[in-house]
Amino acid sequence: MYQIFFFFLPLLHSYASAQTPPPFRNGDLVANFEPSLAVVTGVLAIMFALTFVLLVYAKCCHIDLRSGSGDRRRHDRRLRQGIFFNRSTASSDRFSGLDKTAIESLPLFRFSALKGSKQGLDCSVCLSKFESVEILRLLPKCRHAFHIGCIDQWLEQHATCPLCRDRVSMEEDSSVLTNGNSFRFLNQSEIREDSSLELYIEREEEEERIHREELSGSSRFSIGESFRKILKLGNKEKTLLDEHVNDKDEKKLMHKFNHRIVVSDVVFKNRWSNVSSSDLMFLNSEMVNSISSERFSSLDHVKRGDEEDQIGILRIKEEMEAKRMLENKLTSMTTMFSSENGDSGSKSRSVMIEPGRRSVSDITAVPRLSISIHGDCSGSAAETASALQNGGNETEERRRRLWLPIARKTAQWFANREKRSQINTTHQHFDV
């Protein structure tokens, strides 16, 4: 600003000296006044004012642009490193790091023990590739791994993951890997590759990330142009494009930072080493007991704890008992009737026929001949005896015809009811 002022000062002096009029009297000076000097002074003042305003504006805008470009460069660098920086959380997390004991309690593992596609995998803090002999520290909640020195230095000042910005909580992290032998393998004192646990890595493909960014709307015009180009291609170009796509599928690029390590505590290398023969015998006995219980007392297992179903089972059992009692009564009645008829027939036959003259047919209660005894009984007496015997047989047959259908229907009704109850219970068991 001062340089510009000193630059215009000689010009102003020379112009003023050139415009100085010859000495006049006081009256002539007032009469012959020319406003050229005032105009020049006003123009120069305006120029100086505009110059000053422009300098101030340029200085302020230059500071803002420089600070904005610096923030943008820092933001781009953090994005390249995979750290999504948040200004609101940066100030709060800067001095809210974890304790040293908490950091040292985080699990460790060797990079060579990791299974899966681990080629080109980098540490998102120092941007260097992992080596097979290096020991990495795992954040159990988000399952991201880093170098020990990198993550320890980071966690001293921040309580979040440098990759996904997820907060590291020791209470939640300790509950993730305390199932069985998981935390034992990942402990610092037992870092080895022959453990029963297996570590797998899940990585995001670079194509998926690009596709997700395209779907967000940032490159929708380029997508439309690429589709138009593909539609305009001929058969030869399409075949070349297909070959290029196939080669690209064979050589899929994995993202360097977006990964997730899965700890598998289910797949064991020596999973049968701790099983003894007594355990197998106990297992077999338990299987036999369960099968036998399911076979012989399936209703009890299905209806256990349900009072209504137990009452229904008791009712079925009572009905079965009543059915058995009815059948027993019917059989006893039939046997009684048959025995009474047999006794009456035998008595009549003993009166009619002498013991020495009885035949086989008389023993079987089917008399073929009606023989008079001692000639005292006439033919009418024999006819009356045979009529009595036939009448007893007819009453027995009538009773059988009357009771047997009733007993058969009753037994069939109880049997059908029992079958229906069993079918319903089995259907309920399968539905459960």
Curated annotation (Swiss-Prot):
Gene Ontology biological process terms, A to Z: protein ubiquitination
The chain's disulfide connectivity reads none
Q: Where are the zinc fingers (RING-type)?
A: 123-165
Q: Which domain of life is it from?
A: Eukaryota
Q: What is this entry's stated membrane topology?
A: Single-pass membrane protein
Name the keywords, alphabetized.
Membrane, Metal-binding, Signal, Transferase, Transmembrane, Transmembrane helix, Ubl conjugation pathway, Zinc, Zinc-finger
EC id: 2.3.2.27
Provide the protein's localization.
Membrane
Its pathway? Protein modification; protein ubiquitination
Annotated TM spans: 37-57
Q: Name one GO cellular component term.
A: membrane
Q: Where is the signal peptide?
A: 1-18
| Gene Ontology MF: a single term | ubiquitin-protein transferase activity
> Which reactions appear under catalytic activity for this entry?
S-ubiquitinyl-[E2 ubiquitin-conjugating enzyme]-L-cysteine + [acceptor protein]-L-lysine = [E2 ubiquitin-conjugating enzyme]-L-cysteine + N(6)-ubiquitinyl-[acceptor protein]-L-lysine
User: What's in the domain note?
Assistant: The RING-type zinc finger domain mediates binding to an E2 ubiquitin-conjugating enzyme.
- Family membership: Belongs to the RING-type zinc finger family. ATL subfamily.
The free-text function statement in the UniProt record for this protein reads: E3 ubiquitin-protein ligase able to catalyze polyubiquitination with ubiquitin-conjugating enzyme E2 UBC8 in vitro.
Q: What is this protein called?
A: E3 ubiquitin-protein ligase ATL42
User: Which organism's genome codes for this protein?
Assistant: Arabidopsis thaliana (Mouse-ear cress)
Q: Which gene encodes it?
A: ATL42
